[in-house]
């Protein structure tokens, strides 16, 4: 009890927020990011036939969040590539995952208990990047709430918001896989986290930044580790969104029903024509019947 009272939550959170990310946590971030790249269809063949394109895709997976954040803030998009240590470390991870003999490195990091450790450490990096991105945006735009939220969001989402560009580098074009249309759990969590950190940065959330980093990191680590261990693609926010979204934005089925009724009312020729137009199937049957009559007359 004395130990628990001596080690308060504030001191623990402050110590946790001061833990350096390089090289251990950044290494885990690179491993998981490039591991997901190898899961993509055709990624292994691309690394054999076009290694430079594969390397560029790996760098996007590792540093795409920095590129997007610099683009939003009007800074050089290749600024982070001046960090030689991170580039060399990410390149070494890319080479080991794709070209290690007998896929030994890939098999080791894919082993589920080891992978869960890397996934947890990646979420530590994600939350820290959200907080740093919002602090950086606040330095340029003191009252730009939406700028801070957008910067923190892209910092946390990583390459997912650039998925279409990354697919083009692999020679794939799937516009239906746009992350904004179909948000995954990390993208949604990064958005909600960016809102929380923006409220804290602007003094609207009465909590210290270190405590918020610690609490949100524990939430992200718990959720992501559970989803990875159970091989689930669902989101913990689905239950909450199922209740809130119909209230705020209406249900999609109700809108479709109204649209169909509106189209059906315009389909008639007016109040004096209660019958709707014939469906396409009945028209085809009528045309087949007329053809049969013509053939009988010809016989």
Curated annotation (Swiss-Prot):
Activity modulation: Channel activity is activated by a change of voltage within the sarcoplasmic reticulum lumen and blocked by luminal high Ca(2+) levels.
Cytoplasmic side: 40-52, 107-144, 200-209, 256-299
SUBUNIT field: Homotrimer; conformation seems to be controled by binding to diacylglycerol (DAG).
Composition-biased stretches (Basic and acidic residues): 281-290
GO molecular function (one): metal ion binding
UniProt-listed GO biological process terms: cellular response to caffeine; endoplasmic reticulum organization; regulation of cardiac muscle contraction by regulation of the release of sequestered calcium ion; regulation of release of sequestered calcium ion into cytosol; release of sequestered calcium ion into cytosol by sarcoplasmic reticulum
Top-level taxonomy: Eukaryota, Metazoa, Chordata, Craniata, Vertebrata
Stretches the record annotates as Disordered: 256-299
Protein family per UniProt: Belongs to the TMEM38 family.
Role, per record: Intracellular monovalent cation channel required for maintenance of rapid intracellular calcium release. Acts as a potassium counter-ion channel that functions in synchronization with calcium release from intracellular stores. Opened by a change of voltage within the sarcoplasmic reticulum lumen.
Binding site for a 1,2-diacyl-sn-glycero-3-phospho-(1D-myo-inositol-4,5-bisphosphate): 122, 126
Xref: InterPro entries: TRIC_channel
Segments on the Lumenal side according to the record's topology features: 1-18, 74-85, 166-178, 231-234
Protein name: Trimeric intracellular cation channel type A
S-S bonds: none
Transmembrane segments: 19-39, 53-73, 86-106, 145-165, 179-199, 210-230, 235-255
